[in-house]
């Protein structure tokens, strides 16, 4: 509602629960749209994108890491497609910021969205939106019918060093401290490397367990794990109640088939050790099993 309006036509990657939210938002705000409907965990391809070339789209919306499945979409292909078709690229990077390399200039990202609660490891409550030059011009010239999410109003207040309403001050202070911590620990590249190593360590060590990683294009922040012959919600519950370990359940059709393991925040290799040990124990007890 700040960047697009009824005169636009946007294309949305919808491969899970968070892609669907972009669809819902466009429907709510009467923004003409079409969706690239992908199977759960499926990556985007050039062949898929080419079907939508030269069709008058003005914007492209994507959750670059679809958190519900863990798939990390091919940003190079998307960026090239948007550049070729003169489309504004909006990237929800909430689950990929500080976990995968992202560069607004290199990747031709016009609107970059993230939040306080993922790899920044602060409490939820702050949304961070970065606008490129083209997006800034859009915001300045667009009429936004919103009291609390009017970016033009926020930008105008920013020029006087203020916000239009009281922000979550304590979370801003925590973000400031967290950014200093990341800088002191070697910077953004070191943080991405640390998270990548945690993710790869976990993925290698579950290969001898009755678990599968079906997604072929993975980001570093989260791994979607399928239980071969166990119910995922049973495993999630056992880990929580018996081992004091919290992993992420899934809802919907895959709720009993899949759970997710995060690799961001203050997690360490020692946390991986505890989780792997618990999963092996569940296997020994016949709760996590190869056969029915």
Identify the residue ranges that each predicted region occupies.
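Conserved active-site segment immediately N-terminal to the catalytic lysine
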Residues: 105-117
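Active-site phosphate-binding strand-loop segment of PLP-dependent enzymes
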Residues: 43-98, 111
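Conserved PLP-binding catalytic core of the aspartate aminotransferase-like
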Residues: 211-242
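Conserved PLP-anchoring active-site segment centered on the Schiff-base-forming lysine
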Residues: 4-18
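PLP-dependent enzyme catalytic core of the Aspartate aminotransferase-like
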Residues: 257-292
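Active-site C-terminal subdomain of aminotransferase-like
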Residues: 117-201
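Conserved PLP cofactor-binding pocket of PLP-dependent enzymes
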Residues: 242-260
